[in-house]
Design a protein with these regions (language model features):
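Catalytic core of nucleotidyl cyclases, primarily class III adenylyl/guanylyl cyclases
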Residues: 1-11, 25-66, 92-96, 114-116
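Amphipathic alpha-helical segments that line or abut small-molecule/effector binding pockets
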Residues: 10-21
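Polar/charged alpha-helical tracts
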Residues: 24, 63, 140-144
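Catalytic/regulatory signature loops of cyclic-dinucleotide turnover enzymes
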Residues: 27, 45-46, 66-87
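Cytosolic regulatory/linker segments at or just downstream of nucleotide-handling modules
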Residues: 49-51, 77-160
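Solvent-exposed, flexible loop/coil residues
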Residues: 53-58, 63-68, 72, 103, ...
Length: 160
């Protein structure tokens, strides 16, 4: 069965900021068990993929395609604690997020990939000083850019 799903790169940016914030809060609390510190690198790209369930006895869901390989490349060439996005994602995200150009990075047997760090939401779209939580202005701009209201954003705005 084939179907098309259109999650937006802006959603991926918001999810990445949330993950980054969660890891930062965990690290700031300290670790009473003295386990190794958790480091997180996030790479984001967007494009067509093929998905499916594989396996005969033990089933697993997986995705394949150039977009998956480029997202993996973005993550592999990221620094710990940062979010690395492709030029395509940056084009979708630049209106709402602060981006830091990194320049092109050569990929083996492929073209160079232009990369950007996604640092935070722009201050006018953020409800916190760190730029991790969207505000109501963000919700209106998101709706204008994507043509749909952000999923569960209104609930997120009301929670601490």
């Amino acid at each position: 069965m084939l179907f098309r799903s259109l999650p937006h790169p802006i959603d991926a940016g918001l999810a990445a900021l949330e993950m980054q914030g969660t890891v930062a809060r965990m690290k700031s609390r300290g670790d009473p068990l003295r386990l190794p510190s958790l480091e997180l690198r996030i790479g984001i790209h967007t494009g067509p993929v093929i998905s499916g369930v594989v396996g005969n006895r033990r089933f697993a869901f997986d995705i394949w395609g150039d977009a998956v390989n480029i997202a993996s490349f973005m993550e592999a060439h990221c620094l710990a604690g940062r979010i690395n996005v492709s030029d395509i994602v940056a084009g979708h995200a630049k209106a709402l997020f602060e981006l830091e150009p990194r320049g092109p990075v050569e990929a083996k047997h492929e073209r160079a990939h232009e990369m950007f760090f996604l640092n935070r939401l722009k201050p006018e779209f953020s409800s916190d000083q760190h730029g991790q939580r969207p505000n109501e202005t963000f919700a209106a701009e998101y709706d204008r850019l994507t043509g749909r209201p952000p999923s569960q954003l209104t609930e997120d705005l009301s929670s601490p």
